[in-house]
Regions:
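N-terminal pro-sequences and low-complexity stem/linker regions of secreted or lumenal proteins
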Residues: 1-312
Length: 312
């Protein structure tokens, strides 16, 4: 705002009236690599309003997110749970499903980025690579390293991704070559990981005690809480999933984990516990802004996280 040189956190619907509804669909800022690292400012965490947007440091009250709040209040909260990567959706979901984005140094994935894919730093999903000014490849697609579901399957642990066709492009397994090949052959990886059994299938399996040992749920676009879709919309699916599991036959042996892939552009004042620079696989030369030099890949900023279970 004009003549303001310092902006402190504020309640987003401070005007009252119907502003509580209006702010449900607002955009905080951007969650991509550039703005997040600029706001992070080498650990000072003081550039949110300028490098992102003034909206990013706003907050909501319990009344604005009653379902999410009640679930968190009733069960166990992970107050120091961080996004894996200080960036946007795809890098964090790639890390979620595989444990890495394949950074160029110190990676446990054998082969070059051009051959193996990555390092996944943005939401690119088309075949090929982006390149730095010096010609180094990054965000290469397809990905070719091993995923967590493949390790589960090798260990004899059953798993499935539950999603509808309108999944907002949020199932990252489609970025891996082995899942693409499996889809062409109508193979097991694709059937479990990139097909569309639907959320009703999850509700039915939960009720009947037929869920696999590990289930992943990818929400439809309208229920994702990604602006302009609202927390009150996401509350519906959070509540329905919880009820399905609680009323299901395997409730006494189930842990239901709720979280988000990235911050959506919302600010945080807590500096993440990023590793020392000697850990080469955790740092990277900033491909977007050379003035940042070597910068941490992550962890990024804190995310909501709660575990719903009879044991939590």
């Amino acid at each position: 705002p004009k003549d303001v040189n310092e902006l402190k956190p504020y309640y987003l619907a401070w005007q009252g009236g119907d502003w509580a509804n209006r702010t449900q669909c607002m955009v905080a800022g951007t969650n991509d690599w550039r703005q997040n690292h600029a706001a992070y400012n080498r650990g000072e965490m003081d550039k949110w309003a300028m490098a992102n947007t003034p909206y990013s440091i706003g907050y909501v009250h319990e009344a604005d997110i009653p379902v999410q709040y009640k679930l968190a209040e009733a069960f166990t909260v992970g107050d120091m749970y961080y996004e894996s990567i200080m960036s946007s959706t795809a890098p964090n979901r790639v890390s979620w499903f595989s444990g890495t984005i394949n950074p160029p140094k110190g990676s446990k994935v054998n082969g070059t980025n051009k051959h193996m894919g990555g390092p996944t730093l943005d939401n690119r999903d088309s075949v090929g690579c982006e390149r730095t000014d010096s010609g180094k490849p990054f965000s290469c697609v397809p990905l070719r390293w091993k995923t967590v579901p493949e390790y589960l399957q090798e260990a004899g642990i059953s798993w499935r991704v539950y999603q509808d066709k309108d999944n907002f492009g949020d199932d990252p397994l489609v970025m891996w070559k082995q899942y693409q090949t499996s889809a062409k052959k109508k193979g097991d990886l694709a059937q479990r990981g990139t097909s569309f059994p639907g959320l009703q299938k999850f509700f039915d399996d939960a009720r009947d005690g037929k869920l696999p040992e590990v289930s992943y749920i990818v929400a439809p676009m309208q229920l994702s809480e990604h602006p302009p879709y609202m927390p009150m919309d996401g509350a519906w699916i959070q509540g329905e999933v919880a009820k399905a599991v609680m009323h299901g036959k395997n409730w006494d042996s189930t842990a239901l984990i709720y979280s988000y892939d990235e911050t959506g552009g919302w600010a945080d004042h807590v500096v993440s516990p990023y590793p020392p620079q000697s850990e080469e696989s955790e740092w990277i030369e900033d491909p977007y802004d050379k003035s940042n030099g070597i910068t941490p890949i992550g962890p990024g900023f804190r995310l909501p996280f709660y575990i719903v279970s009879p044991w939590t």
